[in-house]
Regions:
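Charge-dense, low-complexity intrinsically disordered segments
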Residues: 175-178, 372, 401
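C-terminal helicase lobe
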Residues: 357, 362-392
Length: 438
């Protein structure tokens, strides 16, 4: 907690520098002097102070790199990590190297003991332990190079069961986040008037709550699905394809979720069963499903006439794969559908990877904030930013694997001994053999 208080007084570009692309933070010389003066010591790097550097780094990362309702949520007095790709809480997982304790101090919740890691392995070396390796996903093509290089696996693209009728519209680009959000709300209002179901995808809990506030202020009835209310996922998704439904969701709704147009009769019937306290009546559910099937079928036909589910993304993700997963919620099994991404030049992705280039473009365009930007240069910058992130993340994974290869040789020896011990009828004989070897 002492370091959390010290770090609060430190200023960016004075006491520390941030590399936003790599999500790293480093104290400057002035920053080191500031910490030394606050602690009343002469040298932060003395052997007796080695833990201080560890605490400082963790607290700086907690302050500058990790954001509440983006990277984690605070629930029941605990810090819960949110998976950036799935939008779900990683139950039982904690950050290492003192970072979790730094976040607990930052959010003023009970600081728990640091976990002790007894064994670890990279995903790559873990998967390589299987003799036969295969997998299925709807978004493997964008990662084809990595599958070949790391796992020596080819990617085979299987045609869809029915032709895709979804229309993927060109990105709508705006100068500021405020202008983008206003355009998003206007689009939702227009679609909602017709009754077309809308799925609005956001990149974080914080963003989903901000959009929800705006929709509430405009009187738009909607549901919100994020890591804070994940227990309601089945009920919310069951209603997401119905006439007039507006669903605001994080990546939770962008992966492996089947949104049925007109609604899901089984799940809706179960909700009625719970509401009417009929859980002990085995006949109720079947009769309710049968009753709802006709209603859902009629509603589905109306939704199809309106163009199916409209998927609206409020920001491009670091990975094209995640964007494709969100688009894929619409136009399933040959149904019509539509998707569009709304982008601001202030979005995290653009700021981190194309900041200077975008600033140069904007100075040339001199457009008002609320005007939509239709420039090929901007579109190319967005594509370039995503390609940069994917390339950087791939390089990070390759480097992690290189370091783990050294440990992997030792790991294989240890696990070989472990297997021998577990399978041996006589441990004494094994110990004697090892004793002789030594």
């Amino acid at each position: 907690t002492e370091f959390t208080k010290i770090v609060k007084g430190m200023k960016r570009d004075v006491h520390y520098d941030i590399d936003e692309a790599k999500k790293q933070v480093h104290p400057t010389e002035l920053g080191i002097e500031y910490v030394e003066s606050k602690l009343g010591i002469s040298n932060l790097y003395e052997n007796s102070q080695t833990n201080f550097i560890h605490y400082l780094t963790a607290c700086l990362r907690a302050k500058t790199i990790f954001a509440k309702d983006v990277d984690y949520i605070v629930s029941n007095g605990q810090i819960n990590i949110v998976d950036e790709f799935t939008g779900r809480v990683l139950e039982g997982r904690r950050y290492s190297d003192g970072l979790h304790q730094a976040l607990e101090a930052k959010e003023n919740v009970r600081i728990q003991d640091e976990n002790q890691t007894l064994a670890s392995i990279t995903y790559q070396n873990y998967f390589r332990m299987y003799e036969n390796l295969a997998g299925m996903t709807g978004t493997a093509k964008t990662e084809e190079e990595e599958f070949i290089q790391i796992y020596n696996l080819e990617v085979v693209e299987i045609p869809t069961n029915l032709p895709i009728q979804r229309m993927d519209q060109q990105d709508a680009v705006y100068k500021t986040n405020e202008a983008k959000l206003n355009a998003v709300i206007e689009d939702i209002i227009e679609r909602n008037k017709k009754g077309q179901p809308i799925l609005l995808g956001t990149v974080s809990v914080e963003a989903s709550e901000e959009v929800s506030k705006q929709l509430t202020s405009k009187g738009i009835v909607h549901n919100v699905l994020n890591a804070k209310n994940h227990e309601q996922e089945a009920q919310i998704i069951a209603q997401a394809g119905r006439l007039g439904a507006v669903t605001v969701a994080t990546n939770m709704a962008g992966r492996g979720v089947d949104i049925k147009l007109g609604g899901n009769p089984e799940e809706i019937a179960f909700q009625y069963q719970v509401k009417e306290n009929k859980l002990d009546d085995p006949m109720y559910l079947d009769s309710k499903i049968h009753e709802l099937e006709l209603q859902v079928s009629e509603e589905k036909n109306k939704v199809l006439e309106l163009g199916g589910l409209y998927v609206l993304g409020t920001e491009r993700h670091d990975s094209r794969r995640i964007d494709n997963q969100l688009r894929g919620r619409s136009g399933r099994q040959g149904d019509p559908g539509e998707s569009r991404f709304y982008i601001s030049l202030q979005d995290d992705l653009m700021r981190r990877f194309q900041g200077e280039r975008i600033e140069s473009i904007m100075n040339k365009l001199n457009l008002p904030d609320e005007e939509r930007i239709e420039q090929s240069m901007v579109t190319k910058s967005i594509e370039r930013a995503q390609a940069q992130v994917e390339s950087l993340n791939f390089e990070i994974r390759k480097n992690v694997l290189k370091f783990d290869q050294v440990l992997n040789q030792q790991r294989e020896v240890i696990y070989k001994w472990r297997r021998q011990l577990l399978r041996s009828d006589s441990i004494e004989n094994l110990i004697s053999e090892w004793f002789d070897d030594v």
